């Protein structure tokens, strides 16, 4: 660790921030030509449950910063609208609209099906298998009863794919509640990966520690054919001062516009407009109980952030698909009497301005795609850290 900390002190901004400057990265309007990079090598990637491509984007940026090119051998998602956004941003990727269970078996011990055999022949020497299985079944933001959701079984696809492709590294991202699933799906997946020869580590991290301007805890699992990867050591190496809402979106205030869907605020109901006005007239950030709807005045609602106003000088609360509505969380703009725009939510999710959401044609699609996305800074940090360890010979 001391060697890593010395390296951190010597080249701090280059290491911990994308392109050495996270804010410059977020405000970049021109997409890098990842496909034309003059590279010293390439990295092969399979991204299951890829969504709009937050994990892929972070890996491309990490690889590019180290002079490497990424070949996306396979990207799969069941959400066609999210996948259209992915394809628009990563045209060279082999992206497939499909339920992963239509491609992979969920039982790691069953014989390979025809599609798995074909993929095994075409994808070899894989570097990274990554994925964030749908988390609705065990999200900390949902009721306990939803931990029974059948989607939890999709975790096992990650172990199945690891057995088929034999990647050097497997990275799984999800909410912390996944670890407490009553069926032990997370721990069982970790054990399956161990059984097929991987060293497995997992930790819960808060993304504001690595510069994402929101309070967003994630459970990270890394399985490695090489030495055990110390996740906390990587996070410590890339740790930054928490980034605030002001840092992320202040420059977008002048884009409050009716011209583009990304910068178009939602229209609140008359009641919610009154609540927003009350927050600003009284210069407060939490709506008093008597100003809330009757159903939220009772004692069974513990989320005080609902109907709240964001603080300029703090990270935002977790961005979800409900960011357009104040009744879904603390999503009222700190300085303007409205909720967040899609552009602002994307910034808080650490998506740069060059990333196109043009294929999301409706407000609902935008909210779902942005709210469900994985902030690219997470995969940037994890993969950049792993690649540097490889370059130093610490992952063998």
Locations of the language-model features?
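C-terminal target-recognition/interaction regions appended to catalytic cores
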Residues: 1-20, 25, 43, 267-396
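Core alpha/beta nucleotide-donor-binding catalytic domains of modification enzymes
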Residues: 21, 25, 31-50, 54-165, ...
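Short conserved micro-motifs on helix faces and helix-strand junctions that flank
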Residues: 48, 129, 238-241, 338, ...
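A structural signal for well-ordered alpha-helical segments within the folded catalytic domains
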Residues: 53, 80, 156, 183-187, ...
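A short, structural micro-pattern
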Residues: 70, 213-215, 243, 313, ...
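Class I S-adenosyl-L-methionine
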Residues: 111-114, 118-126, 136-306
């Amino acid at each position: 660790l001391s060697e890593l900390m010395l390296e951190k002190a010597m080249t701090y901004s280059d290491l911990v921030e994308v392109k050495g400057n996270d804010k410059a990265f977020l405000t970049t309007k021109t997409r890098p030509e990842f496909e034309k990079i003059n590279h010293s090598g390439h990295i092969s990637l399979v991204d299951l449950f890829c969504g709009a491509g937050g994990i892929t984007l972070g890996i491309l940026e990490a690889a590019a910063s180290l002079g490497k090119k990424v070949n996306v051998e396979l990207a799969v998602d069941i959400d066609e609208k999210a996948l259209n956004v992915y394809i628009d941003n990563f045209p060279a990727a082999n992206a497939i609209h499909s339920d992963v269970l239509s491609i992979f078996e969920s039982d790691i011990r069953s014989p390979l099906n025809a599609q798995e055999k074909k993929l095994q022949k075409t994808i070899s020497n894989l570097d990274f298998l990554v994925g964030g299985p749908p988390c609705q079944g065990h999200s900390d933001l949902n009721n306990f009863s939803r931990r029974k959701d059948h989607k939890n079984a999709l975790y096992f696809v990650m172990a199945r794919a690891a057995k088929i492709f034999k990647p050097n590294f497997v990275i799984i991202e999800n909410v912390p509640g996944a670890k407490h699933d009553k069926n032990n799906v997370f721990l069982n997946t970790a054990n399956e990966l161990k059984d097929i020869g991987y060293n497995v580590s997992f930790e819960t991290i808060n993304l504001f520690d690595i510069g994402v301007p929101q309070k967003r805890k994630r459970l990270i699992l890394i399985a490695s054919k090489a030495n055990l990867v110390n996740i906390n050591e990587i996070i410590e190496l890339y740790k930054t001062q928490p980034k605030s809402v002001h840092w992320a979106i202040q420059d977008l205030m002048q884009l409050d516009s009716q011209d583009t869907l990304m910068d178009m605020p939602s229209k609140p109901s008359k009641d919610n407009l009154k609540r927003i006005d009350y927050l600003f007239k009284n210069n407060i950030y939490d709506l008093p109980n008597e100003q809330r709807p009757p159903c939220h005045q009772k004692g069974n609602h513990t989320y005080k952030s609902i109907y709240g106003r964001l603080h300029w000088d703090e990270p935002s609360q977790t961005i979800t698909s409900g960011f357009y509505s104040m009744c879904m969380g603390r999503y009222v703009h700190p300085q303007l009497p409205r909720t967040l725009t899609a552009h602002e939510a994307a910034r808080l999710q650490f998506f740069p301005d060059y990333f196109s959401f043009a294929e999301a044609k409706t407000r609902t699609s935008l909210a779902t795609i942005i709210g469900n996305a994985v902030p690219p800074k997470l995969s940037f940090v994890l993969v950049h850290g792993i690649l540097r360890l490889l370059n130093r010979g610490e992952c063998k």
